[in-house]
Curated annotation (Swiss-Prot):
Short name of any one Pfam family annotated for the protein: ABC_tran
Entry protein name: Cytochrome c biogenesis ATP-binding export protein CcmA
Source organism: Pseudomonas syringae pv. syringae (strain B728a)
EC number(s) stated in the UniProt entry for this protein: 7.6.2.5
Any single biological process term in GO: cytochrome complex assembly
Amino acid sequence: MIPATPFLQATALACERDGRMLFENLDLHLHTGDMLQISGPNGCGKTSLLRLLCGLMQPTAGQILLDAQPLGRQPAAPGRKPLWIGHAPAIKDVLTPLENLSWLSALHQPDGADADTIATALDAVGLAGFEDVPCHTLSAGQQRRVALARLYLPGPPLWLLDEPFTALDRQGIEQLEKHLAEHCEHGGMIVMTTHHSLNRLPAGYRDLDLGQWSA
C-alpha cells in the first residue's frame, strides 16, 4: 500500500544561525496520529527547527511542505495553519486570560472561540475563576497554563510545542501528557521539544535526535 501524503514534510533541511550551521540534510515527515519529539544537546537547533516548521524562520536550504503545499508560499487553508506555542507564554500581560484566548483563537478560526468555549478550556487547565483577571497578576505557572489552554480550543491538527511542560506542577504535567497523547490518538499531530520524560506515548510516537544532523 502506498502511504498517504504526509501532512508535514521536510526535505534536505538546513539551518544556519549567526554564521554557524546548526544542522543540514534533515528529512522528516508527519502523518495523522504522529508525535515527533525533537531531542539533542543544547545549541543543536531544536527551537530553530520548530520555528522553521511553523514559518517563523526560513531554512538555509531544503523545502518544507505543509498539507502538500510549500510552507509560506501561500496562506494555509483555514484551520490548517500549525498551532505554535513557544517556550515563553506569548500572552499580553494587560489582557485577561479570556481576552488573550479570544484573539489567539482568531489566528486559527475566522471568528475565534466564544466565551463559553474559552471558559471550558481555562477550566481544563485549572484556571476556572481566573477568566477576567489581568495576566500580569498571575504566577509564571498560571501564565503558562493560559498559553496551553489554546490546546483545548477547536483548532488545527498540527501542534508545534517548545518545552510545553515548563513551569507546570506534577498534576499539570500528568494532565498535559494525557491531552497530548489523546490529540494524536484522535488523528492530530505534534512536534515538540521537551526535557521531560514522557510516561504516556501514542502509537505514532518517534524521537528525532537532532544532534545526528549537526554540521
